[in-house]
């Protein structure tokens, strides 16, 4: 089975083209593939298929709202093998792969996901690099919109706002947090949060207050741990930072350890613009891949 390896601001993925959705994935196979010692290593896996093929193969029970059979479908799995609704960095890499491989000839097209359709605009593309904007849909503040939820990260307690970006986020902006303190946080330590409020877990962003139109953040993704970037997390961070200033709309640059992205929040949707890099192409050893399925 052929693969590509790519990243969006160092949030890295294994891309598996499987247009007819013929390959059966187990959580153990995905986890092994993403393991940085046992497999190729990645924050997640992007299966490239169509929505219609995914339904026919049983990957989807039904088409997500707004997604048609002919749309491309990003079947995204976290590094632990669990299924995820959406990944903003993953969509950019997914779109880059489609254009660079010749599977898609248009610069503007729809990528389906469990969170619904995502319109992408590929501003530049070559075999190595791409610049992609993703319409991420409306990001919704949950609850009162104020910092109503608490979490302990790296031994430090933060208050945050819950944001739905097609997947759940807890964005914690601390006006007193310095860049040095942000860098020193141990995001590998156990995270303590209210499991009643977030029974399925939540992605957690810790961010500074905006300065000159920029916020800086780190992220702990559910099912993965700390990653160098999280696309939906940068959207959630922008929503939280704007809300702290009493604004519902605006544009911010969000700096993560893996680089910068630009987030625009409007009354009706949100946009994520950033880079994608395809670093490798290869072929998985069938004997290894299918031995993992047999061992489950």
UniProtKB/Swiss-Prot annotation:
PROSITE patterns xrefs: DAP_EPIMERASE (PS01326)
Gene3D superfamilies per the UniProt record, alphabetical: Diaminopimelate Epimerase, Chain A, domain 1 (3.10.310.10)
EC id: 5.1.1.7
GO terms, molecular function: diaminopimelate epimerase activity
GO biological process entries: lysine biosynthetic process via diaminopimelate
Pathway(s) of this molecule: Amino-acid biosynthesis; L-lysine biosynthesis via DAP pathway; DL-2,6-diaminopimelate from LL-2,6-diaminopimelate: step 1/1
Residues annotated as catalytic: 87, 230
Gene Ontology CC annotations of this record: cytosol
Record-listed substrate binding positions: 11, 78, 88-89, 167, 203, 221-222, 231-232
Presence of the UniProt keyword Protease in the record: no
Site (Could be important to modulate the pK values of the two catalytic cysteine residues): 169, 221
Catalytic activity, as annotated: (2S,6S)-2,6-diaminopimelate = meso-2,6-diaminopimelate
Compartmental location: Cytoplasm
Parts forming coiled coils: none
Cross-referenced SUPFAM superfamilies: Diaminopimelate epimerase-like
Keywords assigned by UniProt, alphabetized: Amino-acid biosynthesis, Cytoplasm, Isomerase, Lysine biosynthesis
UniProt xrefs under PANTHER family: DIAMINOPIMELATE EPIMERASE, DIAMINOPIMELATE EPIMERASE, CHLOROPLASTIC
Function of the molecule: Catalyzes the stereoinversion of LL-2,6-diaminopimelate (L,L-DAP) to meso-diaminopimelate (meso-DAP), a precursor of L-lysine and an essential component of the bacterial peptidoglycan.
Similarity section: Belongs to the diaminopimelate epimerase family.
Subunit comment: Homodimer.
Protein name per the record: Diaminopimelate epimerase
Protein's organism: Mycobacterium leprae (strain TN)
């Amino acid at each position: 089975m052929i693969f590509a390896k790519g990243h969006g601001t160092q949030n890295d993925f294994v891309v598996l083209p499987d247009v007819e959705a013929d390959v059966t994935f187990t959580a153990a196979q995905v986890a092994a593939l993403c393991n940085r010692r046992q497999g190729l290593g990645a924050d997640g896996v992007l299966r490239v298929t169509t929505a219609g093929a995914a339904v026919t193969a049983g990957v989807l029970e039904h088409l997500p709202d707004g997604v048609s059979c002919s749309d491309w479908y990003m079947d995204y799995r976290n590094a632990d093998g669990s299924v995820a609704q959406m990944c903003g960095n993953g969509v950019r890499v997914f779109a880059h792969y489609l254009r660079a491989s010749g599977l898609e000839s248009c610069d503007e097209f729809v990528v389906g996901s469990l969170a619904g359709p995502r319109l992408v605009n590929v501003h530049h593309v070559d075999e190595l690099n791409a610049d992609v904007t993703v319409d991420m849909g409306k990001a919704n503040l949950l609850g009162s919109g104020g910092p109503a939820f608490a979490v302990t990260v790296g031994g430090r307690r933060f208050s945050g706002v819950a944001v739905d970006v097609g997947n759940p986020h807890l964005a914690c902006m601390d006006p007193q947090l310095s860049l040095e303190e942000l860098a020193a946080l141990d995001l590998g330590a156990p995270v303590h949060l209210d499991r009643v409020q977030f029974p399925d877990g939540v992605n957690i962003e810790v961010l500074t207050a905006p300065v000159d139109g920029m916020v800086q953040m780190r992220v702990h993704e559910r099912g993965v741990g700390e990653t160098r970037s999280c696309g939906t997390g940068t959207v959630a961070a922008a929503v939280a930072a704007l809300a702290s200033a009493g604004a519902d709309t605006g544009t911010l640059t969000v700096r993560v350890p893996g680089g910068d992205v630009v987030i625009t929040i409007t009354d009706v949707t949100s946009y994520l613009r950033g880079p994608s890099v395809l670093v490798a192409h290869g072929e998985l050893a069938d004997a290894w891949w299918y031995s993992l399925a047999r061992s489950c």
